[in-house]
Every structure is written in C-alpha cells, then in structure tokens.
C-alpha cells in the first residue's frame, strides 16, 4: 500500500495515496484499503474542541481507520491517561501503529477487533462512534461501555432514512415513521436522538444531548450517559413524542400520539412522524463553554466556519420549537416572492436563523404571527 503524509490540525498522519486508487480520474475514500475522508475535517475540528472541554481520562475511538480522530484528540485536546484506537481491518490497525508512533504517542492501546466485540469487553469515559453510514449497530454496545456520566459521540451519514426520503429504511433502522417534511433536516436529528434514548432505556440508562449539529451530509451528536431505570422512564415520558405538519397550511407542532389529528388552523389531517426527541439539542452551560473556548483553536483550517456555526447555534438554542422553513411555508401559502429572512426576523422581533437551513427561522412565537410577517413582507 502506497502511503501519503497529510497534515490535519496539529498532527501528521499517513493515509493511502488517493492517486493509487482512482477510477477513471475520480477517487472515493471508500475505494482505498483504509478509509480517510478529508471532507470530515470540520467534524473532527469541532470534536477536538468538545473533547478539550471534557478532558476524559480514557478515550476510545471504536472505528479508527487511520487513527486520525483519536490521535488528534490526544495531541490537540487532552493528553488522556489512556487512548484506545480500534479497527477490525488489519491493514488499518497496522497503519494506526505507524501514525501513533509518527505523532509521539506512547500510551495508546491499539486493537484489531470488531467494534461491538471490543465495546462489550471494556469501559471508557469517552467513546467515539464515527461509522460509514448509520450508527445504529453500535448504539447499545457503546452505551453499555460508557461509565456513569460518560460521553458517547455519534456521527450519522445516512440522511436518506432520517430525513424521510427512505421511509422503509427509517422504520427498519430507527423504528420510526417518517416522511419528507419542511423541517426534516432538524427532525432527522431528533429521530436519531429518540432512537438512542430508547436503546439506552433497555439497559436502564438514558442520554441527554450535550451538543449536536447538522453539517454537509451528516449529523454529529454528543450525549451524556446517565444510569437508572427511573431516569430512563422520565426521559421517555417527557421527551419522546411525535411531530405533525399540516400539508395544506404548513402549521407544525409536537403531538402526543401517532393518531389521526386535524390541523387546528385549516382542519386538514396532519402528516405525523416519530417517535422522536422533543427536548433541547444542546446543554446550554456546555454550549457557553464552547463559545468561550473556541477562539483558542484559531489554528484550525475550519475555524471561521466553526465560529459562524456556533454564533448561529448560540442564538437559536434558546427556542424550544422546531424551525419553520420559510421557503416551504411560502410555497404552501401560494406566496410567490419569498421575503428576506432578515426582514422576517425583524418583523417577528424575537426569532433567529437556524443552522439547519438557510431559509429557516426559529421562534417560539405563534404560527399566526409568522404568517402575518410572511404575507406582509411579500
């Protein structure tokens, strides 16, 4: 395997040379014998900031590939007492050995095992699950392997089922009814969290989001794991519900049950999806710590993008409602010219943009007030 040295953050690692695995002048990271995707640098950059605040004693990257993520955590975030890197691909495990040595890390434990098998053998304070596709096969094992009040980080790239484009796949993987709705970018993340909560409950544990976001073609989610059947029951009863959207007028709301429900505005039957998580997507105290800290990482290649994302999330995090997609709402209302988002925010007074969609707004003001602004500004 021909290797190429690359720099990401403050580390230098060897990866398969893309030129050796091109097909008709094109390259996909999955074609190489060991997976490395430079498009996920933003994901890793933000994760470096998160881990720097958590300072876990044990870090476990269960699906390490080149080892880039765990190595960056150790070098840039926090020199943990123990760094555990694993990949079931023996070629990847060998490459991890090279990359760990290349970055002067002496206390790393490297495994060449199936991720689930390893997760049922050991415990960790911080576990990272960054699979190719859905994290569902690793939810139970990662929650089980996390110590009390530990953290699990999940990446999900299978947006088709989560956003309602592939309904049967969503039902099969996430045990949720789904449709493509106006706010599906956010609802997909809530379906994912709902699935994790239900899986954790089978172990008499529960999870709460610490920080989460949507970017490019994936969701990234950090959850804190708590033990106790009572806590699991409370979280399910309080934070797992359904979501309804009116296909005629665009009114949307959380609903308690998956049953035929009429829109209170126009009387049309709701399209209902779920179950999904209805609580906050971030821990506000932790979010504040991220905002206070990220400037220390101005060397990151995606620093400006991180700054923009955190600025938007800081503003939208205080609102409890799912965002309204003004473009989709205007279409349902037969409003031909979509008003500028900034004008709608000014009209509403208490509202913000959302990172989920460029034409989305988040506010706790009522549907009627949003409609008034949309129509008055056309």
UniProtKB/Swiss-Prot annotation:
Reaction it catalyzes: guanosine(26) in tRNA + 2 S-adenosyl-L-methionine = N(2)-dimethylguanosine(26) in tRNA + 2 S-adenosyl-L-homocysteine + 2 H(+)
EC number: 2.1.1.216
Task performed by this protein: Dimethylates a single guanine residue at position 26 of a number of tRNAs using S-adenosyl-L-methionine as donor of the methyl groups.
GO biological processes: tRNA N2-guanine methylation
Keyword Transferase attached: yes
Family, as annotated: Belongs to the class I-like SAM-binding methyltransferase superfamily. Trm1 family.
Extent of the signal sequence: none
Alphabetic keyword roster: Metal-binding, Methyltransferase, RNA-binding, S-adenosyl-L-methionine, Transferase, tRNA processing, tRNA-binding, Zinc
Descriptive protein name: tRNA (guanine(26)-N(2))-dimethyltransferase
Residues reported in the UniProt entry to bind Zn(2+): 246, 249, 263, 266
One annotated GO molecular function: tRNA (guanine(26)-N2)-dimethyltransferase activity
Residues annotated for S-adenosyl-L-methionine binding in this entry: 44, 69, 87, 114-115
EC main group: transferase
Gene that encodes it: trm1
Domain Trm1 methyltransferase: 4-374
């Amino acid at each position: 395997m021909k290797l190429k040295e690359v720099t990401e953050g403050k580390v230098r690692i060897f990866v398969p040379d893309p030129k050796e695995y091109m097909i008709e002048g094109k390259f996909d990271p999955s074609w190489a014998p060991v997976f490395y995707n430079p498009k996920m640098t933003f994901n890793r950059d933000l994760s470096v900031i998160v881990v720097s605040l958590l300072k876990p004693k044990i870090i476990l990257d269960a699906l390490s590939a080149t080892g880039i993520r765990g190595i960056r955590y150790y070098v840039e975030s926090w020199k943990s007492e123990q760094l555990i890197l694993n990949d079931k691909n023996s070629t990847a495990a060998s490459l991890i050995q090279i990359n760990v040595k290349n970055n002067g890390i002496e206390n790393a434990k490297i495994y060449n095992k199936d991720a689930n098998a390893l997760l049922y053998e050991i415990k960790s304070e911080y576990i990272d699950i960054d699979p190719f596709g859905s994290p569902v096969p690793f939810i139970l094992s990662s929650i089980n392997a996390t110590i009390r009040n530990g953290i699990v980080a999940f990446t999900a790239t299978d947006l088709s089922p989560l956003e309602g484009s592939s309904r049967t796949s969503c039902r099969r993987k996430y045990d949720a009814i789904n449709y493509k709705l106006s706010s599906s970018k956010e609802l997909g993340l809530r379906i994912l969290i709902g699935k994790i909560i239900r899986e954790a409950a089978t172990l008499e544990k529960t999870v709460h989001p610490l920080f989460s976001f949507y970017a490019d073609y994936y969701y990234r989610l950090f959850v804190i794991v708590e033990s106790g059947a009572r806590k699991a029951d409370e979280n399910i009863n309080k934070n797992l519900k359904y979501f309804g959207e009116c296909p005629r007028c665009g009114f949307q709301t959380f609903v308690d049950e998956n049953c035929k429900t009429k829109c209170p505005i126009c009387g049309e039957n709701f399209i209902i999806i779920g179950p999904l998580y209805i609580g906050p997507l971030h821990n506000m105290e932790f979010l504040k710590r991220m905002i206070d800290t990220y400037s220390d990482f101005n060397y990151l290649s995606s620093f400006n993008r991180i700054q923009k994302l955190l600025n938007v999330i800081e503003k939208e995090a205080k609102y409890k409602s799912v965002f309204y997609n003004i473009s989709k709402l205007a279409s349902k209302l037969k409003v031909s010219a979509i008003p500028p988002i900034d004008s709608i925010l000014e009209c509403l007074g208490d509202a913000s943009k959302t990172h989920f969609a460029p034409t989305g707004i988040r506010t706790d003001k009522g549907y009627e007030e949003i409609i008034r602004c949309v129509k008055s500004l056309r």
